[in-house]
Amino acid sequence: MPQNEYIERWQKQHGKRFDHDERKRKRIAREGHDGSKKAQNYRGLRAKLYAEKRRKEKIQMKKTIRAHEERNVKTSEPAEPSTEALPQYLLDRSNEKNAKALSSAIKQKRNEKAARFSVPLPKVKGISEEEMFSVVKTGKKTAKKSWKRMITKPTFVGPGFTRRPVKYERFIRPMGLRYKKANVTHPELSVTVQLPIISVKKNPQNPLYTQLGVLTKGTIIEVNVSELGLVTAGGKVVWGRYAQITNNPENDGCLNAVLLV
């Protein structure tokens, strides 16, 4: 048995207290009071974080309650035209239908819409700042300062990029780690083409890395797909499309990406 499961081990050997279930029920029932007390007494950043956590819990709870209510709601739909003549007092009546089918159809449509924007790698491993940046010391020998950082991962900078003066440049992007092209695979056509990168749309690690144009696994980039000859329904040539990086460029020395279609 794993070392951290000593409570379960003890319970298997000796059993539980006779009032274990009752105590557990009461503890769960008291959680609301404890949460309220914390919300009233926390201050500063701790209070903000706790309030945000409580807000998300309440949203989830409301969704669950609404889902339970939806199951038994009945809605009326117009009856099919009858062949027999109905009396006046029966004309406003119609067949009742359970709303669950309608609700599930709406949810299905929402899921389909969300699937259009799904990516090949929904989750990626986090990268620490120590791994991303190396400290560069600067200044006189007697009073060196460590405010500069060198990016150790591949980056993309636009064609019109110019460095800031050395004295004011906080983040250094080495020339050897700058990429301009990516090997993009089209999932439906099953072809791989080397396409120029237009921009970095989103780095999942940190908004700062997006701003700096850092290229890590899972990053969404915009590539120029005019060479593929893709056209819209209206007949216009598609210029830029998003793609997601699927490899670790710092290890492989190249950028591999999958086009989001």
UniProtKB/Swiss-Prot annotation:
GO terms for cellular component: nucleolus; preribosome, large subunit precursor. Residues 1-84 are annotated as: Disordered. Keywords: Nucleus, Ribonucleoprotein, Ribosome biogenesis, rRNA processing. The keyword Flavoprotein does not apply. A motif (Nuclear localization signal) lies at residues 15-22. Residues 1-22, 49-74 have a biased composition (Basic and acidic residues). Its main location: nucleus. GO terms for biological process: maturation of 5.8S rRNA; maturation of 5.8S rRNA from tricistronic rRNA transcript (SSU-rRNA, 5.8S rRNA, LSU-rRNA); maturation of LSU-rRNA; maturation of LSU-rRNA from tricistronic rRNA transcript (SSU-rRNA, 5.8S rRNA, LSU-rRNA). It is found in: Nucleus, Nucleolus. Pfam families: Ribosomal_S8e. Belongs to the eukaryotic ribosomal protein eS8 family. Ribosome biogenesis protein NSA2 subfamily. Component of the pre-66S ribosomal particle. Interacts with NOP7 and RRP1. Interacts with RSA4 (via WD repeats). Involved in the biogenesis of the 60S ribosomal subunit. May play a part in the quality control of pre-60S particles. This is Ribosome biogenesis protein NSA2. It comes from Phaeosphaeria nodorum (strain SN15 / ATCC MYA-4574 / FGSC 10173) (Glume blotch fungus).
